[in-house]
Amino acid sequence: THEHVDHISGLGRMQRALSARTLWQDNCTVWLRNPGNTTPVLLAALSVSRGAAARDFLRELHLKTETYAPDMTFAERVSLDWGALHIEGYATPGHSRGSACYRIGAQAFFSGDTIVPGCAVITRLRGGDAAVLGEQTVPFLRTLPPELTLYPGHGRCGMTLGEGLADIRW
């Protein structure tokens, strides 16, 4: 759903284990090709706070920094069929430049961090833009069927998209 490390840190392992193909919004590509942007959070935090000793310890744990290249990308929208499932992807910038939401089948809507029930959408990180979220993304999301089942990147699953949008703030 977007390029932040808490959403992509298992991507390489999943691709290798499942021969999985990836699809993401164009703006993720530059970010995910830079190893400084894909460092596991624990490694980054300890490296800064504890220096070389922490980096050596974490290397022994085999925590890896990987870069990623997509199999497919899209700019604004994408529509494709995967077996019997129809998938639609929508660029939803605001939380990050590369944020995207995905409608899978007739009912499922994966929002990543574009909608996080009970929390304000974080737009203060690099690439975030509260104005774009409020002026472009939220109005677009309100055009989608409100009865879609919402699966956010964090928090409670199972509410409807309409319920998630009624609570959205930034």
What are these regions (language model features)?
Residues T1-S79, R169:
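Active-site HxH/HxHxD metal-binding segment of metal-dependent hydrolases
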Residues S79, H86-W170:
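Metallo-beta-lactamase
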Residues S9, L32-R33, A84, G118-A120:
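Activation segment
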